[in-house]
Amino acid sequence: MVFSKISQVAHYTPKQVISNDDLSQIMDTSHEWISSRTGIEKRHISTVEMTSDLAIRVAEQLLAGSGYDATALDFIIVATISPDASMPSTAAKVQAAIGATNAFAFDMTAACSGFVFALAMADKLIASGAYQRGLVIGAETLSKIIDWQDRSTAVLFGDGAGGVLLEASEQQHFLAEALHTDGARSQSLTSGQSSLRSPFSQGQEVNSFLQMDGRAIFDFAIRDVSRSIAAIIEQSGLAKEELDYLLLHQANRRILDKMAKKIGMPREKFLENMMHYGNTSAASIPILLSESVQNGQLKLDGSQHILLSGFGGGLTWGSLIVKI
């Protein structure tokens, strides 16, 4: 059988950093108010770089680290809710920029679960035996879809990108998977809504900015996502103690605190970096993954077990247990 493994990780964020104090200059908020409720202290906000620019920088790093030429790639998947345009896809722009002429490329829209969903799909592509390697990238410029007059959302989000190189392996590294969607609760978190505009249609005004029912999302994460994580750990056959770290979507420190108690695992096993980046949606998990390899917490030598879990708009939520 053919399996897949994560062989390279990388991340990139815009240079401009906006602190909570900076936000307090343009809206009614404060560092204490934001940090005490979310754990967020600052975020990176793009000045000129688009989502594809961030993703391209990640792709270039992944190739440089691997030693592969871009023509060796079979596919590129970019998870994003803030693409440069509806078409061409962000992934197509990455493919062109790095010269991956043999790769097919497409975007995946699953909000903050996007990277986990995309990684699960990429694992199946390689396991089919038809493809040898590809890039999976989460990239966002959420700053362009936020209403900067709405402090309930504007203080939460940031821009950035992260990704992995996935390639064929003789050993199994993806040990368990659980992906979920509940479209009946879709109105709890929305963005990019559009109206019919033809001369033959009856359009209506819509709010295209990101809108979120914070309490509903908080409750959803604590209830549904925690239950799913507990179930996938049991499904994997691993004892909780055998999981080295859990890398969850970086939405809110309070969510991680409550999840640790709900699942019954030590809080120190839940890695976090939302204090530096805010919520970067599909980019949050791969940025955290890359940073954790960079700082030595994760070895990338096949000796550790980690759980990746994303949750957000859709509603969507999904988890993977990976030997890394």
UniProtKB/Swiss-Prot annotation:
GO terms for cellular component: cytoplasm. It is found in: Cytoplasm. Its EC number is 2.3.1.180. CDD domains: KAS_III. The keyword Nucleotide-binding does not apply. It comes from the Bacteria. It holds the Pfam family ACP_syn_III. Residues 250-254 are annotated as: ACP-binding. One of its GO terms (biological process) is fatty acid biosynthetic process. It catalyses: malonyl-[ACP] + acetyl-CoA + H(+) = 3-oxobutanoyl-[ACP] + CO2 + CoA. InterPro entries: ACP_syn_III_C (IPR013747), ACP_syn_III_N (IPR013751), FabH (IPR004655), Thiolase-like (IPR016039). The active site is at C112, H249, N279. Keywords: Acyltransferase, Cytoplasm, Fatty acid biosynthesis, Fatty acid metabolism, Lipid biosynthesis, Lipid metabolism, Multifunctional enzyme, Transferase. GO terms for molecular function: 3-oxoacyl-[acyl-carrier-protein] synthase activity; beta-ketoacyl-acyl-carrier-protein synthase III activity. Pathway: Lipid metabolism; fatty acid biosynthesis. The last Arg residue of the ACP-binding site is essential for the weak association between ACP/AcpP and FabH. Belongs to the thiolase-like superfamily. FabH family. Homodimer. This is Beta-ketoacyl-[acyl-carrier-protein] synthase III. It comes from Streptococcus equi subsp. zooepidemicus (strain MGCS10565).
